[in-house]
């Protein structure tokens, strides 16, 4: 009976949060809109993400800025669920965060492998990762090569699977992605 109450509360919390998500029909309607400002106007008019979009100014109507806001909302939702859970349920959520961590590492690998000149733009994720993750964004943004990136992951569980590829010839981004996915699953 205890598990029913414990998990029933979590399921109820998630269902309540789920009711505020976009439906497949909403996505179809959004796909028919022309331009980011039209999508934002539709989301505002239909009551989605008001706490995120209400403060958005016209100069921040760039897709990248909006993606950052929505990603932060995803992290905020994770935090709400995490705080609601007991210690046993938090163990699962700690495993679930690996998805966010591997996405972050993949992003950083793309930056260093493709030698992008633009600096890492990860400061908007910093608070979340500092609190819930073993990965230091401060260390990752200093990486300019794959070797540096892997070294900056030394104190994490991702160091071993990635460092195993380091001395092999012809390693590509796909190989690193595959190693992370295999480790995660």
What spans do the regions from the language model cover?
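N-terminal domain-start signal
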Residues: 1-185
């Amino acid at each position: 009976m205890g598990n029913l109450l414990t998990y029933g509360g979590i399921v109820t919390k998630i269902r309540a949060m789920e009711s505020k998500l976009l439906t497949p029909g909403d996505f179809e309607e959004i796909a028919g809109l022309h331009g980011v400002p039209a999508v934002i106007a539709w989301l505002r008019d239909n009551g989605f993400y008001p706490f995120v979009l209400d403060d958005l100014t016209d100069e921040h109507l760039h897709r990248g800025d909006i993606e950052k806001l929505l990603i932060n909302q995803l992290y905020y939702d994770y935090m709400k669920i995490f705080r609601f859970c007991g210690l046993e349920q938090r163990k699962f959520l700690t495993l679930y965060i690996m998805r966010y961590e591997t996405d972050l590492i993949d992003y950083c690998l793309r930056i260093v492998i493709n030698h992008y000149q633009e600096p890492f733009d990860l400061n908007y994720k910093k608070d979340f990762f500092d609190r819930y993750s073993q990965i230091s964004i401060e260390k990752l943004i200093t990486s300019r090569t794959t070797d540096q990136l892997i070294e900056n992951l030394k104190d994490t569980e991702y160091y071993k699977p990635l460092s195993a590829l380091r001395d092999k010839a012809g390693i590509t981004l796909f190989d690193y992605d595959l190693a992370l996915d295999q480790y995660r699953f």
